[in-house]
Amino acid sequence: TCYPGGCVIGRRPIDLHLLALRQLGADIDCECEQITVRADKLQGTDLRLSFPSVGATENALMAAAAAKGVTRIYGAAREPEIEVLCRFLEAMGVRIDGIGGSLLTVHGGERLQDVEFRVPGDRIVAGTYLGALMVAGGELCLLGAPTDHMAGTLTALRQAGCLCKLYPDRIYARMKERPQPMDLSTGPYPEFPTDLQSVMLAVASVAQGRSRIRETVFEERFATAGELKKMGADISVEEGT
């Protein structure tokens, strides 16, 4: 049986998604190669996530908004994308307490309203452009970069020698020399994002010295190393580092 969830970087089970929906009252059938979900009458409840999964938190939030009563989500992910989704649901008329923390309280069951909403800039895309700058050198101005949500990324970039100046709506960055060696570890927000690990691996491959990068989220995220080695990079991978 093959279910959604998973890709070349590692296992991405959907068990937490299904558990949250079941606890809210959804009827879920898993048969053959398909999952059928019926959600006629969702009821608010207490949800406890064993891992701060971004996707499971998002699904729980949206289902809780439609459920009657109060839902408390313990162990919620704290990524900026969760906060943005909460603000979007708030704009539609859902009351949510604890935004930005690991306990979210959703007062659901109200009729949702039409709304116009602006999605902020993507922190991973911004980090990718900055990583490209560190390899190529030169100067870069990123308009619309979500600087408030990039502390972990900017710390790593500065450690490697990138000069970054922050403004309310942009980042000005300059790279004058080859990157310096770095020592970083991935983790849930606000730590360094796993989605930028392969970018920093490319940066480390041209750095002046030995870097150490630890991956704590996805077990196959270092597959990039093999491709960089084909291009001449000196990389060894041992036990997630």
Can you say where each PLM-predicted feature lies in the sequence?
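Structural preference for solvent-exposed beta-strand-turn elements
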Residues: 1-241
